């Protein structure tokens, strides 16, 4: 059978493909592209070969109260801070509530959300799973879930129809943090956590901290620091029937024109585009891009907010931050689903921490041994 010439490897580990010689070495094509050093080296093997490259990337962000954001340096300290505020969660008045995180009520979505930015720590150098790190992930996620558990039980009792199990939200990585930032103005959550993929996403994050100066944002580091989110990891099949055409297409994706096709789905990996003005240009600093409203939980008043173009200084700070990110998150659905499935059973109290970690190890090692 003939497979496709160009492979989109999102959610799939390319290691096996590369080891079996199924992927073309892209280093020749990409040498000309002038990629950002930090992204390129993350995918360059010891012998200089490159079997896959993301077309764009995202930056993990955390936003919330300034002191709290500064206190979060990894997953355990995130759990510490959320636990510290335990007494504030729940119904603060008849129709106003506060939770640790937006996904706090839904074990599956919460774990998937947290997995995103911790998963890079789960693999050992030798390509096997690190049980200690998996255990730490499950343990800290459980603390985060427990921090909001009483509040959720209170909400469920007050609004049973809102918590119908069939209505579970589905976590979408590409959803970006921008939609979550408004809950900070209304004080419904302790933190907004997620990723930014565009100048507009960054405008949301930055504007919230300008509207409410008690808020701040920072790179969100989990069990592993300085991670980025790869978007559309591309490879060329070594059995490609139209190899020249496939190479031309990949060259185009990593050209200035190809990188500028869309500005919504990730930051450019080509240095000249990333460093340039065009990609980031949203008009004059301070111009209003979007307006929105959310009801303020403290006094019930409607809050109207404007998302404005960030200053050049703020954009430059973000650009510098993007160049410091060295490790892609583990983009492997088989591993993350094993962790999240067993994690849900642990969060729900059906199995112990050790049982959950063992189940993950067994499931994943079977898969890795294939």
Task: List where the protein language model places each region.
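Hinge/lid segment of periplasmic solute-binding proteins
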Residues: 9-61, 76-77, 212-219
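C-terminal capping/gating helix-and-loop segments adjacent to ligand/active sites or protein-protein/ligand interfaces
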Residues: 290-368
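Extracytoplasmic/periplasmic solute-binding protein
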Residues: 51-55, 60, 79-142, 146, ...
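Glycine-centered hinge/linker elements that transmit conformational signals in sensory
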Residues: 124-177, 206, 213-218
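Early extracytoplasmic/lumenal segment of secretory-pathway proteins
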Residues: 1-14, 163-167, 171-179
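A ligand-binding cleft/hinge motif common to bilobed small-molecule-binding domains
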Residues: 12-18, 194-212
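Extracytoplasmic/periplasmic substrate-recognition and gating elements
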Residues: 205-278
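Short glycine- and hydrophobic/aromatic-rich loop-to-beta-strand nucleating segment
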Residues: 60-64, 234-235
